[in-house]
């Protein structure tokens, strides 16, 4: 198998944490981000989700049943799913990494009663016309007490910024992961 320049496989185990990538609405685990993670972090869990938000959440709940110490990476609609899962199961989640999350699509108020304190890193392109960054930031700031929000020079797909992030750092707990 040929690797793209600059992409290397992570050779060492990353502890007992369970890393999960959740794709967006019109994507799959075989999209650009899923392929990146599959190549570099073969132990990362991925699944394909279909249907409405609630149908997808049922699929995600089943996929993650019995797992703990989760680091959830959610892209767009997958970011919304990751946030909802964390609201419902905060003790199981160690960290969230949200990529242009579609947080404004539903009223998250019914899913949480108090702010969540797990570390959350949010990247959002300032040129995103699919999911405007400022409303997503406002929702995230209400839900997550430990939020590191990064607006970046990119669009919704984050194709320029995504591969340059310090994923080794982001996927370890307690590290910011910013280059």
Where do the model's predicted regions map?
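Catalytic active-site module of serine/aspartate enzymes centered on a nucleophile-bearing elbow/loop
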Residues: 162-179
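Active-site catalytic motif of lipid deacylating hydrolases and related acyltransferases
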Residues: 15-68
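Gly/Ala-rich beta-loop-alpha elbow adjacent to hydrolase catalytic centers
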Residues: 74-82
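Short beta-strand/loop motif that positions the catalytic acidic residue
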Residues: 122-124, 128
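A conserved short beta-strand
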Residues: 92-103
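Conserved alpha/beta-hydrolase "acid-adjacent" motif
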Residues: 129-135
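Catalytic histidine-centered segment of alpha/beta-hydrolase-like enzymes
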Residues: 154-163
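Short glycine-rich catalytic loops that host catalytic nucleophiles or stabilize transition states
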Residues: 48, 149-155
